[in-house]
């Protein structure tokens, strides 16, 4: 299954280099930052925002900091060993974890590059967008 595959993959990677450091370097790279959509930076600042991803949290910590997002929810993974802790954070599990982290919530706008994996979140959102190469396309379920 995907969770086992990710554990093996990250476990092998962790043997070769620091997963946290590599992720930090990736997000600090100007080429990576240049690919981030302007729409994100131009968003209304009065709404709470959460990054919720199937990626390991250590991969996105620097991104959350750069983007000014205070809440990050991702797949739990030991960055030293690469072993996943618990379930992969996608689909219904992602919805559950968001609720666990923030309590009762509503999704005003949902942005994703994977409509299939994030179907439950798109279905719960007032507005949904598919992001392709930084371009937003309204989701039509």
Please tell me what each predicted stretch does:
Residues 1-20:
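Alpha-helical membrane-targeting segments
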């Amino acid at each position: 299954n995907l969770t086992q595959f990710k554990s093996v993959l990250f476990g092998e990677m962790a043997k070769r280099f620091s997963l946290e450091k590599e992720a930090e370097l990736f997000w600090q790279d100007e080429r990576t930052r240049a690919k981030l959509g302007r729409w994100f930076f131009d968003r209304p600042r009065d709404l709470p925002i959460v990054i919720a991803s199937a990626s390991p949290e250590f991969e996105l910590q620097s991104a959350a900091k750069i983007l000014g997002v205070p809440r990050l929810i991702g797949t739990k993974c030991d960055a030293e060993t690469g072993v996943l802790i618990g379930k992969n954070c996608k689909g219904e599990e992602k919805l559950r974890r968001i609720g666990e982290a923030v309590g009762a919530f509503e999704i005003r706008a949902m942005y994703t590059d994977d409509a299939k994996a994030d179907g439950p979140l798109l279905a719960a959102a007032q507005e949904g967008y598919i992001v392709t190469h930084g371009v937003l396309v309204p989701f039509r379920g």
